Amino acid sequence: KNLGVSTITVENAYDQLIGEGYMFARPKRGYFIADVSDIRVIKAPVQKELSIKLPPEQDESIFDFSSNRTDSGNFPFSIWAKLMRETISLREQELLSVSPCGGVRELREAIASHLSSFRGMNVDPDQIIVGAGTEYLYGLLVKLLGTDKVYCVEDPGYKKISQIYECNNAKCLPVQMDEQGISVELIKKANAQIAHISPTHHFPTGITMPVNRRYELLAWANESSDRYIIEDDYDSEFRMNGHPIPPILSIDACEKVIYINTFSKSLTSTIRISYMVLPEHLANEFYRRLSFYSCTVSTFEQYTLARFI
């Protein structure tokens, strides 16, 4: 009463002090101050100069010849900003909701429609898993397919792929390329179960795998139930002439191809939105075993990209 506060406020203060160990209560006796004199207070050590070696930052060169970037001058900033405003206006409740582990349905439906019209692929939205970058999806695939298998990658190839597999405790073997792409005979000699390839536009050679080699790979995968082809369709959107070659998934009749692509080349590398298309039985396995993983792309970006597509 003297302090001008309510009884509830005083009781809450006592409960807080008891909860933190500064006081204790005895029935019918009252409240008592706890003895904290024996508690040792550990002083923070004197801050020393750290020697953390960070990777060097990329220089803003006058001429950028790197192959993994897009021209920022061509990005449709005005359209993207407009779609972001529309998303905030039309998706107030959805933006505050947790995204499904595979990504929001609107984006998965937009991707499925895009793949149908642009790549000739007939996929169900429920087969599509959205993630922040292909590197994250590679890690999910190791967890889905298992570390007891041998993963083969193209040699030469994108070094980071083998690094990610090895960091996820998967055995990874480089397989040499010939003029038509990765060698199926060498895959067999390596006793591999998983072949990670980029048949449409191989990095760094630029080789496009011919149709006969694609069928050879499918025949290899069909020889055993535990064999799969990871088709990395990175940088497949652009060709000097004609339409892009249909992906291996479009000729896969036995559900042996896992398709991966990203929007980092068609939009910008800083928008970390990628996706993979799983065969039906692997999609069911993913949702049964790995659905506890949260989608790593914000709902805001997902809804905005869905409207953009």
Features from the language model and the residues they span:
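N-terminal basic, amphipathic alpha-helical segments
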Residues: 1-85, 291-298, 306-309
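PLP-dependent aminotransferase class I/II
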Residues: 257-309
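A generic "structured core" feature
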Residues: 3-9, 17, 155-165, 192, ...
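Short glycine-rich anion-binding loops that position phosphate/pyrophosphate groups of nucleotides
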Residues: 70, 200-202, 265
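Residue-level recognition of strand-loop junctions within catalytic nucleotide-signaling folds
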Residues: 34, 200, 279-280
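Walker B catalytic acidic pair
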Residues: 232-233
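Conserved core of the PLP fold type I
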Residues: 84, 94-226, 237, 243-258
